[in-house]
Design a protein with these regions (language model features):
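Acidic/polar loop patches that form or flank catalytic/metal-binding clefts of enzymes
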Residues: 124, 149-155, 179-182
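Histidine- and/or cysteine-centered catalytic micro-motif in compact active-site loops
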Residues: 94, 126-129, 157
Length: 220
């Protein structure tokens, strides 16, 4: 969720908003980029951060970075009052059921659009296309987001700890394209060591299986 938009926008990303993600995983990866100046982490449950700091220190290790500002509040309410502020918004949410359901609505995506700068990008977890229930949730999220942004593309990753292991993520913008605007030379020059991501994989991740394309076409 982090390296894909960074490899596209590069040093244009100065200010980032993460909604959810209280474990600190996204923040840890963001903090590896020295040009990022400010990271707001909006987490509704203070206990999530406290527990992860204690029991998952390898994930939560950057939550005390001076660039990171943790706001314990509802992301739905927070985003409503923000306009033209962030270069990148990452929605590291739970599934679209119960408390997390509001983070998949058209209203929420519209507010994210408003909160981004002109060149800004929204990245969100988009559920799995594999099992029927998850696939329906994926469709609903995609329907809502394509009505909120001029450009929306999905990319996939293999995550064995998630149901089916096949998971989708969204990349949405006013026109920035995740493949055509990729800057592999810049990203590779950073010399970041990653376990999964590389710029060749980046391009391939946006080429989706036929059954996923058909699923998404029904709501586009």
């Amino acid at each position: 969720m982090v390296h894909v938009p960074l490899a596209v926008l590069g040093e244009k990303i100065k200010k980032v908003l993460v909604i959810g993600g209280g474990d600190g995983g996204c923040v840890r990866e963001l903090c590896r980029y020295q040009h990022i100046e400010h990271i707001d982490l909006v987490e509704i449950d203070e206990r999530v951060v406290a527990v992860c700091k204690e029991y998952l220190p390898g994930v939560a290790c950057s939550l005390d970075d001076p660039r990171v500002h943790i706001l314990y509040q509802d992301g739905l309410k927070y985003i409503r009052r923000i306009e033209d502020e962030y270069d990148l918004i990452i929605i590291d949410s739970t599934d679209p059921f119960g408390p997390g359901e509001g983070l998949f609505t058209m209203e929420f995506y519209g507010n994210c659009y408003k909160a981004l700068k002109e060149h800004g990008v929204l990245v969100n977890q988009h559920e799995s296309p594999f099992y029927k229930g998850d696939a329906l949730a994926c469709q609903r999220a995609h329907r809502n987001i394509v009505h909120s942004f001029e450009l929306s593309r999905l990319f996939q990753a293999h995550i064995p700890t998630y149901p089916s292991g096949h998971w989708l993520f969204g990349f949405s913008s006013r026109g920035v394209h995740p493949v055509r605007d990729l800057n592999p030379d810049w990203w590779n020059s950073l010399g970041l060591e990653t376990k999964y991501y590389n710029t060749n994989l980046h391009k391939g991740a946006f080429y989706l299986p036929n059954y996923v394309q058909k699923l998404l076409e029904k709501v586009e």
